[in-house]
């Protein structure tokens, strides 16, 4: 029956069955048969009304099964009639629409979808009725699901059929403030999508509607931010932060010169560009209304009621400049001119914040519009020259910066020079000082076309300004003018020589000695490196130092004479005291003798009397004191190559940190004395010190934190947990520890140990970085006490540098600190026998990289705070890690390796499933950084391929910000693998570059992940096979369409990678086939419509020309048109000229 056409009798029987008491299953089955007939054949026209009536009755039934069958059949009937005879459908639309609109709010998604589809069908025959029901019934009803579905239908109809939505805007504004959060979100998304492609006038009207209906600010800002108008102009980069010319460097004074008599220099204003949230306008009328609205706030005098409105108005103008106001530049500049008097009131306000906003606005107008603001210059220059003469330092400096910005951006006129001349004659020092900088800005800007100055009388004014400045009563003005004079001399040397000839002998001498003098041979030698102190390592001259340095040298010599003889103990009886100076960057850091000797203790600090040391062989008298020992240990080449050089910073005076309360009860030797805690002071190297072998971890820390006098320019590192953790880690057997010097990064107890000679392997004889003064003697056996370390999982990432100094096969042991009690001292042989047994309570701590549960246990102490400290009496009872044999040390290594392998496999699985989040990647990086030898070839390849696939995935189900963060961690993990497994990485370079190209295509140049992609690509090309990279990339870029945004990004990045490979690999020479592929790629991209792709193609051609030579290059590019060839030739010549000075040097 289902395959036959419906008859009138069947339709009549449908109504009879639905009204009867027949079983539900029979009704559902009959409706289903009717539905099949509708789907297969046309409906008899005479029965259409009865069929609609029956199916509407089934749809409104109380039984879900019958409703399902009836509503689906009704949807098929609507579709059938829209094709068979739309007139029949239009007659039933009025009676069917209420039922369909009611189903828009059904609980089941299926029915809501069917209702939306039915509305689309009915809209084709009765559009007015459908819109009326949707707008006046569904959208304003009480059912939130109906509201959401109706908005989705509206968006669908607009996108597919171009439905005008203007009449829906008031209803959508009401829905933006609906009580239901889901409705508000749907309304917000609907408004954004509807207006995204709307004209600018409609977007401007939308902003007014949002204000009129008082939509909450968060929703309003989200909508406006999404509807940023499209601009034909590329986004303007941030204004440069150096409008002020660099002042001339100060004359080099000796270290003894005191500046106490001079006036303290007020810190300069912050020139860091302020980050402004862009504000966008859509039409000229909107911009004009906005400026007219704020004009009222600038009327009259500044009061408590209007100053904040003025500040907000100026800030809004700055936001407009950061937005798209350049698309309406005429309207904006006309508006600014109309309120210029008000802006000047803001600039001259006594409120600093208001003045700063005004100056910032003028600077940004100058940077953005340049000569277009010429009509405003006269009033502004008068205002700022007057403001620069004020007594308020911040306002004066702001005026100086703003005038410099204006002069560097606007068109030169003779009036500008007149303003500078007036400033040179001002009675205040500040304008006269600033005028020299303004004059220098004019000279540098107009020096290339000096006829502007010559034909308008500007040169005469410049000469008058220079003469007046060189004869000024203030020395600062004279000094600034000398620098400006030499800029003038570079343009008009004859006139400058005439000015110099009129000066007296002293003034001429000072002028010739000025650092800006290009004729001075010593100009470059006498300038100290900026940012460092006046020590001998930072000064450029080799002349004798000042009187103060001579006094310090004399004190050092006297202290060396007064040192007592070296005792037989393992330490010096006293340590030279650090002499601090009043200047943080003193030129000399010498040490003087302490006034009294101390006995006992292993540092220079005063100590309580300690117990008698156990009977053992005396330390050789030739050993130098710990406090002045050379702290540069010799390290294997492999360790040096993997440990990055610590960053050099300026020595600064730091506040002494509080001393941790009894961090270790085993020894007090490393606690620094109060006199030695001051940073930036170096102890003098003892002439009797012999080179010693330090702990690997401690020696690394000490060599960075306490350099010798020979390396005085290395300054103190910032204390970090990484250094502390390293100092607590057990050291390898071949090295002997020293006490922590006064400048250790953390003031925590660190034990001093000496290893028995029989435990030192032969491979430990590494040369130290300092010359050997005396032959190395065998150290005496001394037990070691290990304090409880503080485990900090957060410091794992920071601790990479220090971790690499530990032997790879040695696990980190954490030993609980026992309660110290006096015990009889055993012999050395007994200690050696007891060492393995004492290590029984050793606990290995592992970290799961993919769990968040990390616990840090703090050590507890049962001893009083103040007590006598037994230095070495009870060390035999403590376990000694280094007394273990190599076999004992590696017992637990397999277990840890297995656990690391399991964690790695778990990470690989999650990476393949693309479920590993940012935190998981950081844990994985920590595992890869700390584990050694966990990679098999298959594991490495699986992890790397999984990372590449994860990197390429668009992560459509994740928010864009989170997706960027995840991909940034993927890049960091790949770079870590590249660093640790460089050889294994080499076969996967080409695959990695393809993945990076795919990733780059999804992001704009402003995305932060782009820089990471480019850096990784630049590293990969240095290790891959050049020919393979050329073949793979040219094949990948061959069919990429440059007309799309993604294609342009891929082409630009690919050619950048190829150019980088040519630049970084001078030994790579492409073959004829490879050259042809590269030339074909470049030739195709030179004809691209995207300017960035064309530029990268030109750069690639320049690199190819530099590599293959003139004739071969042009033969390969013979099919390229003449215009691109001219451009390529220009850049080739430009590069050759840039390289010429380097080659000549």
From Swiss-Prot:
<feature type="repeat" description="HEAT 2">
    <location>
        <begin position="168"/>
        <end position="206"/>
    </location>
</feature>
<keyword id="KW-0493">Microtubule</keyword>
<dbReference type="GO" id="GO:0005881">
    <property type="term" value="C:cytoplasmic microtubule"/>
</dbReference>
<feature type="compositionally biased region" description="Low complexity">
    <location>
        <begin position="229"/>
        <end position="239"/>
    </location>
</feature>
<dbReference type="GO" id="GO:0005815">
    <property type="term" value="C:microtubule organizing center"/>
</dbReference>
<dbReference type="GO" id="GO:0008017">
    <property type="term" value="F:microtubule binding"/>
</dbReference>
<keyword id="KW-0539">Nucleus</keyword>
<keyword id="KW-0498">Mitosis</keyword>
<feature type="compositionally biased region" description="Low complexity">
    <location>
        <begin position="663"/>
        <end position="676"/>
    </location>
</feature>
<dbReference type="GO" id="GO:0060172">
    <property type="term" value="P:astral microtubule depolymerization"/>
</dbReference>
<keyword id="KW-0677">Repeat</keyword>
<dbReference type="InterPro" id="IPR016024">
    <property type="entry name" value="ARM-type_fold"/>
</dbReference>
<dbReference type="Pfam" id="PF12348">
    <property type="entry name" value="CLASP_N"/>
</dbReference>
<feature type="region of interest" description="Disordered">
    <location>
        <begin position="226"/>
        <end position="271"/>
    </location>
</feature>
<feature type="region of interest" description="Disordered">
    <location>
        <begin position="816"/>
        <end position="839"/>
    </location>
</feature>
<keyword id="KW-0963">Cytoplasm</keyword>
<comment type="similarity">
    <text>Belongs to the CLASP family.</text>
</comment>
<keyword id="KW-0206">Cytoskeleton</keyword>
<dbReference type="GO" id="GO:1990023">
    <property type="term" value="C:mitotic spindle midzone"/>
</dbReference>
<feature type="compositionally biased region" description="Low complexity">
    <location>
        <begin position="580"/>
        <end position="594"/>
    </location>
</feature>
<dbReference type="GO" id="GO:0005634">
    <property type="term" value="C:nucleus"/>
</dbReference>
<dbReference type="InterPro" id="IPR024395">
    <property type="entry name" value="CLASP_N_dom"/>
</dbReference>
<dbReference type="GO" id="GO:0090307">
    <property type="term" value="P:mitotic spindle assembly"/>
</dbReference>
<feature type="repeat" description="HEAT 1">
    <location>
        <begin position="96"/>
        <end position="134"/>
    </location>
</feature>
<keyword id="KW-0131">Cell cycle</keyword>
<feature type="region of interest" description="Disordered">
    <location>
        <begin position="510"/>
        <end position="793"/>
    </location>
</feature>
<keyword id="KW-0132">Cell division</keyword>
<dbReference type="GO" id="GO:0005876">
    <property type="term" value="C:spindle microtubule"/>
</dbReference>
<dbReference type="InterPro" id="IPR011989">
    <property type="entry name" value="ARM-like"/>
</dbReference>
<protein>
    <recommendedName>
        <fullName>Protein STU1</fullName>
    </recommendedName>
</protein>
<dbReference type="InterPro" id="IPR034085">
    <property type="entry name" value="TOG"/>
</dbReference>
<comment type="subunit">
    <text>Interacts with microtubules.</text>
</comment>
<feature type="compositionally biased region" description="Low complexity">
    <location>
        <begin position="696"/>
        <end position="708"/>
    </location>
</feature>
<dbReference type="GO" id="GO:0051301">
    <property type="term" value="P:cell division"/>
</dbReference>
<comment type="function">
    <text>Microtubule binding protein that promotes the stabilization of dynamic microtubules. Required for mitotic spindle formation.</text>
</comment>
<feature type="compositionally biased region" description="Polar residues">
    <location>
        <begin position="535"/>
        <end position="545"/>
    </location>
</feature>
């Amino acid at each position: 029956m289902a395959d036959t056409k419906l008859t009138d009798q069947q339709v009549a029987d449908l109504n009879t069955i639905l009204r009867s008491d027949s079983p539900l299953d029979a009704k559902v089955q009959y409706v289903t048969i009717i539905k099949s007939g509708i789907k297969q054949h046309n409906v008899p026209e005479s029965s259409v009304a009865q069929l609609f009536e029956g199916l509407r009755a089934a749809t409104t039934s109380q039984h879900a099964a019958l409703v399902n069958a009836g509503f689906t059949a009704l949807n098929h009937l609507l579709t059938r009639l829209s094709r068979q005879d739309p007139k029949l459908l239009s007659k039933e639309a009025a009676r069917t629409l209420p039922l369909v609109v009611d189903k828009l709010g059904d609980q089941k998604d299926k029915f809501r979808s069917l209702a939306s589809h039915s509305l689309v069908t009915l809209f084709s025959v009765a559009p007015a009725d459908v819109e009326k029901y949707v707008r006046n019934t569904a959208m304003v009803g009480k059912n939130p699901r109906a509201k959401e579905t109706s908005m989705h239908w509206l968006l669908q109809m607009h996108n597919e059929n171009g439905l005008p939505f203007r009449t829906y805007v008031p209803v959508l504004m009401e829905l933006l403030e609906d009580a239901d959060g889901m409705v508000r979100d749907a309304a917000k998304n609907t408004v954004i999508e509807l207006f995204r492609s709307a004209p600018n006038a409609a977007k401007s009207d939308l902003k007014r509607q949002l204000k009129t209906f008082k939509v909450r600010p968060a929703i309003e800002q989200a909508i406006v931010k999404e509807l940023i108008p499209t601009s034909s102009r590329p986004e303007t980069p941030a204004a440069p932060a150096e409008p002020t010319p660099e002042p001339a460097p100060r004359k080099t004074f000796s270290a003894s010169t005191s500046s106490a008599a001079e006036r303290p220099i007020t810190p300069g204003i912050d020139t860091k560009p302020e980050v402004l949230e862009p504000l966008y306008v859509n039409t000229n009328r909107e911009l004009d209304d906005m400026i007219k609205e704020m004009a009222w706030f600038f009327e009259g005098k500044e009061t408590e009621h209007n100053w904040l409105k003025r500040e907000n108005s100026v800030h809004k103008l700055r936001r407009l400049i950061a937005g798209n106001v350049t698309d309406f530049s005429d309207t904006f500049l006309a508006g600014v001119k109309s309120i210029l008097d008000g802006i000047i009131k803001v600039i001259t306000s006594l409120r600093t914040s208001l003045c700063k906003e005004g100056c910032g606005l003028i600077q940004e107008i100058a940077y953005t519009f340049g000569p277009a603001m010429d009509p405003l210059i006269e009033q502004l220059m008068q205002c700022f020259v007057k403001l620069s003469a004020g007594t308020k330092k911040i306002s004066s400096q702001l005026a100086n910066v703003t005038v410099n910005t204006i002069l560097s951006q606007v068109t030169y006129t003779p009036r500008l020079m007149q303003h500078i001349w007036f400033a040179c004659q001002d009675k205040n020092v500040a304008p006269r000082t600033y005028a020299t900088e303004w004059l220098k800005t004019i000279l540098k800007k107009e020096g290339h076309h000096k006829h502007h100055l010559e034909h308008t009388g500007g040169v005469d004014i410049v000469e008058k300004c220079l003469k007046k400045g060189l004869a000024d009563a203030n020395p600062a003005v004279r000094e600034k003018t000398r620098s400006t004079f030499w800029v003038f001399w570079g343009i008009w040397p004859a006139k400058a020589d005439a000015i110099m000839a009129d000066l007296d002998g002293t003034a001429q001498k000072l002028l010739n000695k000025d650092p800006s003098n290009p004729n001075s041979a010593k100009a470059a030698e006498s300038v100290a490196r900026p940012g460092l102190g006046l020590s001998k390592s930072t000064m450029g001259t080799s002349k004798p130092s000042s009187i103060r340095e001579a006094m310090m040298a004399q004190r050092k010599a006297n202290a060396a004479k007064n040192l007592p003889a070296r005792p037989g103990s393992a330490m010096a009886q006293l340590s030279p005291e650090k002499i601090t100076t009043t200047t943080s960057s003193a030129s000399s850091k010498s040490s003087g003798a302490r006034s009294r000797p101390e006995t006992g203790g292993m540092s220079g600090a005063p100590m309580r009397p300690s117990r008698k040391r156990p009977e053992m062989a005396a330390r050789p008298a030739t050993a130098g004191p710990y406090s002045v020992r050379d702290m540069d240990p010799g390290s294997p080449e492999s360790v040096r190559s993997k440990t990055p050089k610590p960053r050099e910073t300026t020595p600064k005076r730091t506040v002494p940190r509080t001393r941790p309360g009894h961090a270790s009860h085993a020894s007090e030797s490393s606690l620094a004395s109060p006199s030695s805690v001051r940073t930036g002071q170096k102890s003098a190297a003892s002439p009797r010190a012999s080179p010693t072998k330090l702990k690997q971890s401690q020696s690394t820390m000490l060599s960075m934190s306490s350099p010798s006098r020979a390396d005085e320019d290395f300054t103190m590192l910032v204390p970090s947990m990484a250094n502390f953790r390293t100092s607590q880690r057990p050291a390898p057997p071949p090295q002997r520890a020293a006490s922590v010097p006064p400048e250790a990064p953390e003031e925590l107890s660190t034990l001093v140990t000496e290893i028995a000679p029989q435990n030192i392997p032969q491979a430990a004889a590494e040369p130290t970085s300092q010359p050997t003064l005396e032959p190395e003697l065998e150290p005496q056996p001394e037990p070691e006490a290990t304090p409880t370390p503080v485990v900090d999982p957060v410091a794992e990432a920071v601790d990479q540098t220090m971790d690499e100094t530990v032997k790879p096969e040695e696990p980190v042991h954490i030993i609980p600190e026992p309660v110290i009690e006096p015990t009889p001292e055993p012999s050395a042989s007994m200690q050696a026998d007891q060492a393995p047994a004492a290590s029984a309570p050793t606990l290995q701590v592992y970290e799961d990289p993919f769990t968040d549960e990390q616990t840090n246990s703090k050590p507890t102490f049962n001893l009083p705070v103040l007590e006598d400290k037994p230095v070495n009496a009870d060390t035999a009872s403590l376990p000694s890690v280094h007394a273990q044999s190599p076999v004992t040390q590696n017992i637990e290594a397999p277990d840890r390796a297995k656990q690391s392998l399991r964690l790695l496999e778990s990470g690989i699985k999650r990476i393949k499933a693309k479920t590993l989040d940012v935190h998981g990647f950081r844990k994985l990086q920590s595992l890869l950084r700390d584990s050694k030898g966990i990679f098999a070839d298959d594991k490495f390849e699986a992890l790397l391929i999984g990372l590449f696939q994860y990197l390429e995935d668009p992560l459509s189900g994740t928010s864009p910000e989170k997706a960027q963060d995840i991909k940034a961690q993927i890049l960091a993990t790949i770079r870590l693998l590249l660093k640790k497994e460089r050889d294994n990485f080499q076969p996967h370079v080409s695959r990695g570059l393809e993945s990076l190209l795919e990733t780059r295509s999804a992001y704009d140049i402003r995305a932060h992940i782009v820089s990471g992609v480019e850096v990784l690509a630049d590293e990969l090309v240095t290790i891959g096979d050049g020919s393979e990279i050329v073949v793979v990339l040219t094949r990948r870029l061959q069919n990429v369409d440059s007309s799309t945004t993604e294609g342009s990004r891929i082409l630009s990045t690919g050619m950048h990678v190829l150019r980088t490979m040519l630049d970084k690999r001078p030994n790579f020479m492409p073959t004829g086939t490879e050259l042809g592929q590269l030339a074909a790629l470049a030739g195709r991209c030179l004809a691209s419509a995207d300017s960035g792709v064309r530029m990268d193609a030109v750069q690639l051609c320049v690199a190819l020309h530099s590599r293959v030579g003139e004739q071969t290059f042009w033969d390969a590019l013979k099919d390229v048109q003449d215009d691109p060839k001219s451009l390529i030739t220009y850049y080739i010549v430009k590069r050759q000229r840039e390289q010429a000075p380097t080659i000549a040097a």
